[in-house]
Amino acid sequence: MRKIFLYFIFIFFTFNNSFACQLLNVPIGSDISNASSTFEFLDDYNEEVFGKNNSARYEDYAADFCDGSDLKGTDLEVIVYQSKIAGINLINSDQENNNLIYEFAKNFIRDPGEQVKNKDWKGYVDLSVGNLVIAYTKTNVGDEIFEYLEISNIEMFDYTID
């Protein structure tokens, strides 16, 4: 009986992380009518306004969509193409906390590696899983460090590029 109880506790905590981060529960390529239950700001999307060949970008605070993460000061960018979710990006430019997205990726997706925590490290790490294209990037813009996590899929990736 004790083993069964421990098993249920383990399952609860395993699934609790992903359910607490609603932004990871929105499938790339899904219709915005489904995604708007998580991202209410998508209710304003109108494909006719953006045209058939243009993507729309919406921004909000990432922390509002991911309980249990430390994404304070991190921007969430949701990219919509032809009424479908083309990409979900996290962007952090907080110079005091420049490894927030690293911690998020490590806890919710996969560890990009300890080397990316180094303040001097700049580059890209492929964290792709299945048909999801996931990239962790750290770069300089001027004197500031920017951290990115970009999530898309093979079919929608081209529509996430400006």
Model region roles, listed by residue range:
Residues 4-16:
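Sec-dependent N-terminal signal peptides
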Residues 8-9, 23, 71:
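Generic detector of short alpha-helix boundary/capping microenvironments
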Residues 20-62, 82-162:
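Non-cytosolic coordination micro-motifs
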Residues 58-82:
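Short, compositionally biased low-complexity segments enriched in polar/charged residues
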